[in-house]
Regions:
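PRY/SPRY (B30.2) beta-sandwich protein-interaction domains
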Residues: 1-232
Length: 232
C-alpha cells in the first residue's frame, strides 16, 4: 500500500490525504517552521553542498551556512543551486554569528576560482567588486541579527545590496561568460554562520512575511519592485 500526502497543512505535516484508509503519520521535533512549499513544479534554490570550500558546510536543509576556522584570505565559500540567468532575482541572508567578517553577494562558478569576478558586501561596510566602480568603502555596516538582501538584475548586471529592508548601494558586476550565483563567505580564519532565504525554507523566524510580485516566496522584507524569489 502507498501513502498520498499533500503536505498542504503546516499544522499537520504528517497528514495522509483524505479518502485513503491509512491514518496520519506522527511527527517528532517538527513544527510549521520546519517546512516550506517546494515541489517539482516550483523548486526553490538552496545552498549547493557540492560547490563549497571546506571547512564550510550546509545544514538546515542546505540553507544554513556554517564555516569554522577557514583558511587563507577568504575563508570558506558557498554558492546556491540555481544560476542567475536572465531576469531579476532576490534572496535574503540572516547573519547569525561571526568572529570575523561576513561577505555576501554574487560570484560566477566557484568563488575560489574567480576572485577577480565577484561582487560582495562585507560586514565592515566595504564592497569588493570587480566590475564598474571597483571596490568602495564607507557603506553601512552590519552584524549578527541583521538581514542582508541581494537583488540581481541579469540584464543590467547589477546587484542591489540592502540591510534590514533598506537599500545600501547598487553595484555593477564585471561582465562574465559564466552565470552568476548568490553566495557568501567569511574572512580569513574566522568562524561564521548565516541563514540563506531564497524564498522557500529558511531556519530563521519570519515575523512579517512578504512575497514577490507573483506571490512566490516568503521573505522578512519585500523584494524590490520587479525582483522575484529564486525558484523555477
Amino acid at each position: 500500500a502507498g501513502f498520498h500526502m499533500n503536505f498542504d497543512d503546516s499544522s499537520n505535516v504528517g497528514a495522509v490525504q483524505s479518502g485513503t484508509s491509512q491514518g496520519n503519520f506522527d511527527k517528532y521535533n517538527l513544527t510549521a517552521a520546519d517546512q516550506a512549499t517546494d515541489t517539482p513544479t516550483n523548486n526553490f534554490a538552496i545552498g549547493n553542498p557540492l560547490n563549497v570550500t571546506p571547512p564550510g558546510i550546509f545544514t538546515e536543509g542546505a540553507t544554513r551556512w556554517v564555516s569554522v576556522n577557514g583558511t587563507g584570505m577568504n575563508g570558506a565559500w558557498n554558492l546556491a543551486t540555481i544560476a542567475l540567468t536572465g531576469g531579476k532575482w532576490h534572496c535574503e541572508v540572516k547573519c547569525i554569528s561571526t568572529s570575523s567578517y561576513y561577505q555576501w553577494g554574487i560570484s560566477p562558478t566557484h568563488p575560489n576560482d574567480s576572485f577577480s569576478s565577484r561582487c560582495f558586501y562585507r560586514s565592515d561596510g566595504n564592497i569588493y567588486n570587480a566590475g564598474s566602480g571597483g571596490n568602495t568603502t564607507g557603506h553601512t555596516t552590519y552584524t549578527a541579527g541583521d538581514i542582508i538582501g541581494m537583488s540581481y538584475d541579469a540584464s543590467a548586471n547589477t546587484v542591489i545590496f540592502s540591510k534590514n529592508g533598506t537599500a545600501v548601494v547598487t553595484k555593477t558586476a564585471i561582465a562574465h561568460n559564466d552565470p552568476y550565483f548568490f553566495g557568501g563567505t567569511g574572512l580569513s580564519a574566522g568562524t561564521y554562520t548565516g541563514d540563506f532565504n531564497f524564498g522557500g525554507y529558511t531556519s530563521y523566524t519570519i515575523s512579517s512575511p512578504e512575497t514577490d510580485a507573483n506571490g512566490y516566496g516568503t521573505f522578512e522584507y519585500a523584494p524590490p519592485s520587479g525582483y522575484y524569489a529564486l525558484c523555477t
